[in-house]
Amino acid sequence: MTLIRALQKIRELGLPAFRTADVAIHLGVSASNASQILRRLHQHDHVVPLKRGLWTWPNTHLMTLTNHLTAPFPSYISLHTALYYHGMISQIPDIIYCVSVARTRRYSTPLGTASIHHLPPELFFGYKLDSSETWAMATPEKALLDFLYLGSGKTRLFAAWPEIDLADSFSHRRFKTMVAKIPDPKRRSYVQRRADKLFGAA
């Protein structure tokens, strides 16, 4: 099979991201042969590696691929990326920030870097699908809650916050309802204290 023919058949899958195993089945070749074909296609800039065994097309926005990175677990865009999307911070993040029930991990790809942060299943809510239903974005309230919640963790990764302006659509009532769902009373109290400080300065 020629490289061009292989590329045509892979495009027939109609997927934004595809696994080496899927390509092997679709092309009717072994996994090692499929891997070799994909590496050659990458050398010619036809496909892009995301992580081991996962590929995508050039010029695909990384934001639309986060669920593929965390599969089989779901994820949604949050933290700095969602705060910027909602106009709550002015600095453009150079990393795509997501939360997921998957473990915390950072993926550096040719398309950019995705930073995935673990949330417990009981806090995996407060997001909306985009119009194409290919990716999900945290609401303004949930993006802030995720930021404050993860700042209370042992790593203190988000302990320092950027200057935040509350979006016009931000609902204090919805935010308070979300805070009440934090199962750990100590972390719930910590998040509420940080929020009160932020709201007092806003």
Question: Would you name each region that the model predicts?
Answer:
Residues W57-A202:
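Nucleic-acid-binding surface
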Residues M1-S75:
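Short beta-edge/loop segments at beta->alpha junctions of small alpha/beta modules
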